[in-house]
């Protein structure tokens, strides 16, 4: 076998691989001898079929199998012998000329193919001891815990039907039918809808007109959908709602005590406070972690500058760009609304894609040299976490991860990355700084904010993660039930 390098430009490589016809013939003969005792051909005793006859009957199919094996296995062997790693799956090209292909299958011509790929650039690890990060720490106050428990108590409060008029804070149960220009519209009908007056869960003007109603009342109200309402056919439109009031209920007083804790499945209010404090600390800890990680990645990005494989950057950019356009569409906005143009946004997100790929390669190299491993138990826990996120789809999710190439890698990648970050935090200078909740949660996008206002851009930029073009490969969640048009939700 002969390997000839035909291209070495930047990170791009192309090799020409030539396997002489006599070598292919020898391989085929070996394979024919292996199958000789197993084949059954009429007119011949088992094991007595002449090799020449076997070649005539099975030669081309065996040669085709050999060709497939070679193009599947040899590129990896060749790259290993050259001390190279391909950034993506190498592209293999063979002759498309049928006559030439037939000669190869009959061992009458050399088998030639090309291997095109981009190498992962060699990365010389640098001393990280000069990196300094600040870890913001928030002390969870008693007031913070009590406020959260108050919210929990409000969500768990009970209501008792009452006679008389509905007031703010009461829960009304209604049937309603919405119309625009006298015609009912999709999503404008509901039965036994429960609404706490004053919660601002429905569109503006809806709840206010129900203050004072009583059980059994029938009423028609007029409202105007907000100009930025997600459903374009309703945005800015005046609508009427025919309402039947089925029940008015007053809220029971909120009492934060052991009885509330018991209702929530806990033994005491002290245990409730302990759990709530832990949840708040965990939430703050996650924010702290992300901000520390951002500082670390920013400084690593300054330390390492090298060319990135174009195909990896292309794949990462497509992931980002797809998300940006989805977010803009859902927000009903355009690039012009965000004081930018599509061309400018593309350029900015291309830079972000390059950064992600570069950091991914750096973290991968650091992790490999440090011996960072993701255990089977960690992978199993990550898979279970995925299953919890998609209730009712557990079987589908399992099948996805079993049968989809790269799916397991999508679970491993973030686990590996976080473990590498943990390793780096033992080598860099970390200074704790006590801050307020407001300071911790203040928007901090740093240099990764590619444009001025776009919420979708915040989502993309905030990740700055070290993927290698393999962003989440998990199946999409099923779409939630369609929201009623009147219900804006308090989310």
Swiss-Prot record:
It catalyses: [protein]-peptidylproline (omega=180) = [protein]-peptidylproline (omega=0). GO terms for biological process: 'de novo' cotranslational protein folding; cell division; chaperone-mediated protein folding; protein transport; protein unfolding. Its EC number is 5.2.1.8. PROSITE patterns: FKBP_PPIASE. InterPro entries: PPIase_dom_sf (IPR046357), PPIase_FKBP_dom (IPR001179), Trig_fac (IPR005215), Trigger_fac_C (IPR008880), Trigger_fac_C_sf (IPR037041), Trigger_fac_ribosome-bd_bac (IPR008881), Trigger_fac_ribosome-bd_sf (IPR036611), Trigger_fact/SurA_dom_sf (IPR027304). Residues 434-491 are annotated as: Disordered. One of its GO terms (cellular component) is cytoplasm. HAMAP family: Trigger_factor_Tig. NCBIfam families: tig. This is Trigger factor. The lineage of its organism: Bacteria, Pseudomonadati, Pseudomonadota, Alphaproteobacteria, Hyphomicrobiales. The gene is tig.
């Amino acid at each position: 076998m002969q390997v000839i390098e035909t291209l070495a430009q930047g990170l791009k490589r192309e090799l020409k691989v030539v396997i002489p016809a006599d070598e292919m013939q020898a391989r085929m003969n070996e394979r024919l001898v292996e199958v000789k005792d197993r084949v059954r051909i009429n007119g011949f005793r088992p094991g007595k079929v002449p090799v020449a006859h076997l070649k005539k009957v099975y030669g081309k199919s065996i040669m085709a199998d050999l060709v497939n094996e070679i193009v599947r296995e040899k590129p990896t062997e060749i790259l290993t012998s050259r001390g190279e790693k391909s950034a993506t799956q190498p592209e293999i090209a063979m002759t498309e000329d049928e006559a030439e292909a037939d000669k190869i299958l009959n061992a009458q011509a050399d088998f030639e193919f090309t291997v095109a790929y981009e190498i992962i650039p060699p990365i010389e690890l640098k001393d990280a001891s000069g990196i300094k990060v600040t870890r913001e720490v928030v002390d969870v106050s008693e007031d913070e815990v009590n406020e959260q428990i108050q919210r929990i108590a409000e969500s768990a409060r009970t209501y008792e039907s009452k006679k008389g008029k509905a007031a703010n804070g009461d829960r009304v149960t209604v049937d309603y039918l919405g119309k625009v220009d006298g015609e009912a519209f999709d999503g404008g009908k509901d039965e036994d809808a429960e609404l706490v007056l004053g919660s601002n869960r429905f569109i503006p003007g809806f709840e206010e007109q129900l203050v004072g109603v009583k059980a059994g009342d029938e009423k028609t109200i007029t409202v105007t959908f907000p100009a930025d309402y997600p459903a374009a056919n309703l945005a800015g439109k005046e609508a009427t709602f025919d309402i039947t009031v089925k029940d008015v209920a007053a809220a029971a007083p909120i009492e934060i005590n052991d009885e509330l804790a018991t209702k929530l499945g806990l033994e005491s209010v002290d245990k409730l406070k302990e759990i709530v404090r832990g949840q708040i600390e965990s939430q703050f800890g996650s924010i702290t972690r992300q901000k520390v990680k951002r500082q670390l990645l920013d400084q690593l990005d300054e330390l390492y500058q090298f060319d990135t494989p174009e195909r990896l950057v292309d794949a990462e950019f497509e992931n980002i760009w797809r998300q940006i356009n989805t977010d803009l569409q859902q927000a009903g906005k355009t690039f012009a609304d965000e004081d930018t143009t599509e061309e400018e946004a593309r350029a900015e997100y291309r830079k972000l894609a390059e950064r992600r790929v570069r950091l991914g390669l750096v973290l991968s190299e650091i992790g490999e040299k440090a011996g960072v491993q993701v255990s089977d138990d960690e992978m199993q826990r990550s898979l279970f976490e995925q299953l919890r996120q998609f209730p009712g789809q557990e079987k589908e999710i399992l099948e996805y991860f079993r049968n989809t190439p790269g799916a397991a890698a999508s679970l491993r990648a973030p686990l590996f990355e976080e473990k590498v970050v943990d390793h780096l935090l033992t080598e860099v200078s970390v200074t704790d700084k006590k801050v307020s909740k407001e300071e911790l949660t203040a928007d901090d996008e740093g240099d990764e904010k590619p444009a001025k206002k776009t919420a979708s851009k915040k989502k993309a930029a905030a990740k700055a993660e070290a993927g290698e073009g393999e962003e989440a490969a998990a199946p999409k969640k099923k779409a939630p039930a369609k929201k009623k048009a009147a219900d804006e939700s308090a989310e």
